[in-house]
């Protein structure tokens, strides 16, 4: 209700919270809370945790048991509860950036990741939304999951997927990430310009003497295999 003070404030987490969904996951007659971890500040795209809060007579308490399957699950951009299998308990579907859509089945005491069972393990993408419905009117739950659109500077295919490396590249305590793209020779090249890299990683300018040289350097030639293996 507009103007009302919050009835409860949840303790802050390391990750940035994203999508929030409600369902009676423990079937006790009240709504429990799923909070999606969107990202970890200054550590993109390191996988983030998501959390389950159980409603106990109007007070939401984080449940380590229910939250366990969502530790380090990824950059969760959207979530929806739905009754997917034959029982009456709400299951959970997630859309994750730099990952796959994920399906978690409710057992009554926790969630089990059944993404592979539903054939979604190979559908990697920059997923940003998910919803459910009986779209073909056959009595079964269908999914609609949205990915990054074609009106983007990014493109990918099964043969040439998008690849990103991330980690503390030079042990300075700063989390780095490197976007790449496949060249005509099927080798990986840095996607960002030399100027972008120089701003984020000034030491990288020692690796090339001209923009022309940089434009022809593969990822391994620019960073070296030992650096890439760290990420």
Where does each model-flagged region fall?
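Beta-propeller-forming repeat regions
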Residues: 1-231
């Amino acid at each position: 209700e507009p103007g009302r003070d919050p009835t409860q404030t949840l303790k802050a987490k390391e990750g940035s919270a994203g999508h929030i969904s409600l369902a009676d996951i423990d079937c006790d007659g009240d709504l429990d809370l799923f909070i999606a971890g969107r990202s970890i500040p200054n550590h993109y795209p390191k996988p983030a945790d998501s959390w389950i809060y159980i409603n106990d007579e109007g007070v939401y308490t984080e449940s380590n048991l229910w939250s366990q399957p969502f530790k380090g699950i990824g950059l969760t951009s959207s979530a929806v509860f739905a009754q997917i299998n034959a029982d009456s308990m709400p299951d959970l579907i997630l859309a994750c950036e730099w990952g796959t859509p994920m399906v978690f089945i409710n057992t009554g005491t926790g969630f089990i990741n059944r993404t592979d069972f539903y054939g979604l393990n190979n559908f990697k993408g920059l997923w940003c939304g998910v919803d459910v419905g009986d779209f073909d009117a056959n009595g079964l739950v269908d999914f609609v999951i949205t990915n990054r659109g074609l009106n983007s500077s990014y493109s990918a295919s099964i043969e040439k997927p998008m690849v990103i490396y991330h980690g503390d590249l030079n042990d300075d305590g700063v989390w780095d990430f490197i976007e790449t793209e496949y060249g005509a020779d099927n080798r990986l090249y840095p996607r960002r310009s030399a100027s972008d890299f120089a701003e984020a990683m000034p030491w990288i300018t020692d690796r090339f003497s001209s923009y022309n040289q940089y434009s022809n350097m593969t990822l391994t030639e620019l960073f070296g295999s030992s650096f890439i293996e760290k990420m």
